[in-house]
């Protein structure tokens, strides 16, 4: 995961200090890209321990089209707690836009199901896109989509995915985003009869919060270790049938966890 450490170092050395919505302050750059070959291991950060359980359950929650944190809470995942209302609702966030995008004529569009079908039927299409950024509903969301749009690409029997992330919390959020979209790419590849290719991560505003500088410096002192391998149950051929038990991580040997505050 040298690419991730390179991003962190680049922002610390070359970023612009800015104020932000949360009042914490950031150092940021605009426009940056990382690439991960999914054939060379699962890109789960090794320079600090990550909570894989949260990453998997959040992705399954997105794919269910769910926007209430009850499923997450039932599975001991708390990453969305700060943004939910008293009933656990978040408004029309990721899952709603992925699976139930509202059309002007009253229909609801299942973008995920549509893109799976298109990958199978027309893999050379340049329209293999899912968007979570819905301008008509952004103000109703507890948190507007940070990872806003992703596109798939098929070549030589391999499925690759590129994510555009408008806003990226490098220390806390980005490691989760890398693992989540890498896993989604692997799942999509399996159900479409393809191998997983690359995950390409493209950023708009990539930033380190000022209260994460010390933690970032500590992480940069650590040497990356070999990437783990993600095993996925080969019997699952329907994207919406995956369960937590269908995933097994092998060979994960990270450095210790580094605690940092979330800016809300």
UniProtKB/Swiss-Prot annotation:
Its main location: cytoplasm. Its EC number is 2.1.1.45. This is Thymidylate synthase. GO terms for molecular function: thymidylate synthase activity. Disulfide bonds: none annotated. The keyword Plastid does not apply. Keywords: Cytoplasm, Methyltransferase, Nucleotide biosynthesis, Transferase. The lineage of its organism: Bacteria, Pseudomonadati, Pseudomonadota, Betaproteobacteria, Neisseriales. The keyword Methyltransferase applies. One of its GO terms (cellular component) is cytosol. PROSITE patterns: THYMIDYLATE_SYNTHASE (PS00091). It comes from Neisseria meningitidis serogroup C / serotype 2a (strain ATCC 700532 / DSM 15464 / FAM18). It comes from the Bacteria. (6R)-5,10-methylene-5,6,7,8-tetrahydrofolate binds at residues 51, 169, 263. It is found in: Cytoplasm. Catalyzes the reductive methylation of 2'-deoxyuridine-5'-monophosphate (dUMP) to 2'-deoxythymidine-5'-monophosphate (dTMP) while utilizing 5,10-methylenetetrahydrofolate (mTHF) as the methyl donor and reductant in the reaction, yielding dihydrofolate (DHF) as a by-product. This enzymatic reaction provides an intracellular de novo source of dTMP, an essential precursor for DNA biosynthesis. The active site is at residue 146. Homodimer. Belongs to the thymidylate synthase family. Bacterial-type ThyA subfamily. It catalyses: dUMP + (6R)-5,10-methylene-5,6,7,8-tetrahydrofolate = 7,8-dihydrofolate + dTMP. Pathway: Pyrimidine metabolism; dTTP biosynthesis. GO terms for biological process: dTMP biosynthetic process; dTTP biosynthetic process; methylation. DUMP binds at residues 21, 126-127, 166-169, 177, 207-209.
């Amino acid at each position: 995961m040298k690419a991730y450490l390179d991003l962190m170092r680049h922002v610390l050395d070359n970023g612009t200090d800015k104020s932000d919505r949360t009042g914490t302050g950031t150092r940021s750059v605009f426009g940056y890209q990382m690439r991960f070959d999914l054939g060379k291991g699962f890109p789960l950060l090794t320079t600090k321990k990550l909570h894989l359980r949260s990453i998997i359950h959040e992705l399954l929650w997105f794919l269910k089209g769910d926007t209430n944190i009850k499923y997450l809470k039932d599975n001991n995942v708390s990453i969305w707690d700060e943004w939910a209302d008293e009933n656990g609702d978040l408004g029309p966030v990721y899952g709603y836009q992925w699976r139930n995008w509202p059309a002007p004529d009253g229909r609801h569009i299942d973008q995920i199901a549509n893109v799976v079908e298109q990958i199978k039927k027309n893999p050379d299409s340049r329209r293999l896109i899912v968007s979570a950024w819905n301008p008509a509903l952004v103000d109703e969301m507890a948190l507007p989509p940070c990872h806003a749009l992703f596109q798939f690409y098929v070549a030589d029997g391999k499925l690759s995915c590129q994510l555009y992330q408008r806003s990226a919390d490098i220390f806390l959020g980005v490691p989760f985003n890398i693992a989540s979209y890498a896993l989604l790419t692997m799942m999509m590849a399996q159900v479409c009869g393809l191998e997983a290719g690359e995950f390409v991560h493209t950023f708009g505003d990539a930033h380190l919060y000022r209260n994460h500088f010390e933690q970032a410096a500590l992480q940069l002192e650590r040497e990356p270790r070999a990437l783990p391998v993600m095993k996925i149950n080969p019997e699952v051929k329907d994207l919406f049938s995956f369960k937590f038990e269908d995933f097994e991580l092998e060979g994960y040997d990270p450095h210790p966890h580094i605690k940092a505050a979330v800016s809300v």
